[in-house]
């Protein structure tokens, strides 16, 4: 298991992801974005899952990026733009 940090473009993404994770019984927590990572709406979700499964929780247009901690720092695994409306 590994812990991943999800950043979002807005709080709507946080709420939608939280609801999906709760419904699936996943282990996660919502918190403020760490100071050394700025961006998005100010909230993030920490998700614990096996490597490779984190991608299924990305919500297009809402998820900004996914990070994990590596060698004492942050590693960006993926970055997503905002979908046009």
Model segments located where?
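C-terminal structural segments of small proteins and small subunits
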Residues: 51-85
């Amino acid at each position: 298991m590994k812990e991943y940090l999800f950043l979002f473009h807005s709080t709507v993404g946080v709420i939608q992801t939280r609801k999906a994770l709760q419904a699936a019984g996943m282990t996660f927590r919502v918190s403020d974005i760490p100071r050394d990572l700025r961006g998005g709406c100010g909230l993030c979700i920490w998700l614990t899952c096996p490597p490779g499964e984190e991608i299924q929780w990305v919500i297009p247009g809402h998820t900004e990026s996914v990070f994990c901690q590596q060698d004492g720092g942050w590693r960006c695994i993926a970055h997503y733009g905002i979908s046009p409306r």
